[in-house]
Amino acid sequence: MSKRRVVVTGLGAVTPVGNNVQAFWESVKTGKIGIGEITRFDTADFKVKLAAEVKNFNAKDYMDFKAAKRMELFSQYAVAASKEAMADAGIEMEKEDPFRVGVIVGSGIGSLPAMEAANQRLIQRGPSKVDPLLVPKMISNMAAGNVSIALGARGKCTNVVTACASGTHCIGDAFRAIQYGDAEVMIAGGTEGAISPVGVAGFTNLTALSTSQDPYRASIPFDKERGGFVIGEGAGVVVLEELEHAKARGAKIYAEVVGYGATADAYHITSPIEDGSGAAHAMTDAMKEAGVQPEEIDYINAHGTGTHHNDLFETRAIKAALGDAAKKVKINSTKSMIGHLLGAAGGVEAVVCVKSIEEGFIHQTVGTKETEEELDLDYCIGGPTRQEVNYAMSNSLGFGGHNAVLLMKKYR
C-alpha cells in the first residue's frame, strides 16, 4: 500500500506569550519573554519562583460555563487550541464524515492541580466530599476526549503519554493514521496545565528547574550558565489532512509532513543517553522516510530545555544525525521564551516550525549569550534569521527515554 501525502491546514495555540497563533507568533518574532513570578500559589517556601503561565485565559470564550466546569485547565487549553486550528483550516464538520475525522491530543501529566485539591478536601472534609468528577477531570486522555466532544470528531481518538515528547508523538501518530488511510483529517498536538505546588516541588527536588529569579536568564538553552528549565503551560494543535482531501475543498496548505521518527534510549528515567544515539536515530529515521539528506535540513527546533544534560546530549545527537551539515543548520529553542510546556511543547513547537516555513523566519534563542566548548553549533544567538526554510525538523525528548522527531517541508 502506498502512503498518502499529509499536509498541515490549520494551527491553534494557547501559550504564555499569546492565546492564539497570531499573538503567539508575533511575540515569538519579537523575542517576547513569557516567564514571570508564579501567581497560582504562594512560593515563599519554594526555591523556584518563576514559571511561564498562560495569561488572561477565559475558558468561557471557547465553551459554555457548564462545559468549562467539567474540565481542568489542560483540557480547556486543548479545546481552545483545537477550535482555533479547525476554524483556521476552514473545516465544517457538517460537511465531513465524522468517523473520518480523528483526534490525538496528549498531555504528559493530566491535572496535578485537581489531584492536589482533591487530596486537601479528602484530608479536611473526608472522602464523601471529594469531587465526583475528579477522575474524568484529571486523567490525561480527557484532553482528546473533550476535543472530540467539542468538535464532533468521531474517528480515531487517542492520546499519547510520553512526558515531554507527548505532543510530537501525537502529531506523528496522527500523520501515520492519515498516511495509511485510517482518517482524512486529524486534530493533533499536546496540552498541559501542571503549574502547581506539587508539580513545581517535584521538578525542583529533581534539580530539573532553573532557580534563577531573572526572567530573562532563567530559561537559557545551550548557554554555559544554564541551570534547568522553567515550567510552562498551554497547548499547541495542528490540523493534518490528506492532500487530495485538502485540495478538493480548496484549503490553504501551510506545509507538508514528510517524516516521523520515534525511538527509545533504554538508558535512564530522566537523562537522555549521553551519546545522543536515541534522538539521532529518530532524526535519521525521519530524514530517511522523507528521502532527504542532512544538508537539506534548513532548521531544527530543538528540544533545548536548558538543562545541562539535555542540551549537551541533544547537540551530540544532532551532530551524529547530520554529520558535517550540523555546523550549517539553524537551531533554536522556543523554550527560551515560553519555558517548557511539557506534554504541550511538541505541539507548540510544531506550530513554530510551520510558521517558520511559511514566513522564512527563524526566531532567536532569547536570553542565551555564550555556550561552552562542545556546544559549537548555530543556536541562533543574538537575533533572528530571515531565510527560506524548505525543511524544518522538530525534536522532542521525554523522561523515560522517549524520542520523537517530525520533519516538515514547504508544500509544492
Predicted features and spans:
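ACP-dependent fatty acid/polyketide chain-elongation machinery
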Residues: 1-67, 244-256, 351-365, 409-412
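Condensing-enzyme catalytic core mediating Claisen C-C bond formation in acyl metabolism
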Residues: 5-9, 36, 214-290, 299
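Conserved beta-ketoacyl condensing-enzyme motif
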Residues: 8, 24-25, 29-162, 191-200, ...
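A glycine- and small-aliphatic-rich helix-loop capping segment at beta-alpha/alpha-beta transitions
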Residues: 22-27, 113-127, 177-180, 200-213, ...
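Active-site-proximal alpha-helical scaffold in enzymes
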Residues: 78-91, 140-144, 148-192, 230-251, ...
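Phosphate/pyrophosphate-binding loops at sites that engage ATP/ADP/AMP, CoA/4′-phosphopantetheine
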Residues: 85-97, 246-250, 283-299, 321-325
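Glycine-/small-residue-rich "gating" segment that lines the acyl/pantetheine channel
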Residues: 124-131, 169-172, 176, 192-248, ...
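Acyl-CoA/ACP chain-elongation machinery
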Residues: 182-227, 260-274, 304-311, 328-378
